[in-house]
From Swiss-Prot:
It comes from the Eukaryota. Transfer of electrons from NADH to the respiratory chain. The immediate electron acceptor for the enzyme is believed to be ubiquinone. It comes from Solanum tuberosum (Potato). This is NADH-ubiquinone oxidoreductase 20 kDa subunit. It is a peripheral membrane protein. Its EC number is 7.1.1.2.
Length: 15
């Protein structure tokens, strides 16, 4: 990822 969400724990934006 790239977004903060992905950094925290791989959310929807995990591709």
């Amino acid at each position: 990822x790239s977004n903060a969400t992905d950094e925290t724990x791989l959310k929807d934006v995990s591709a």
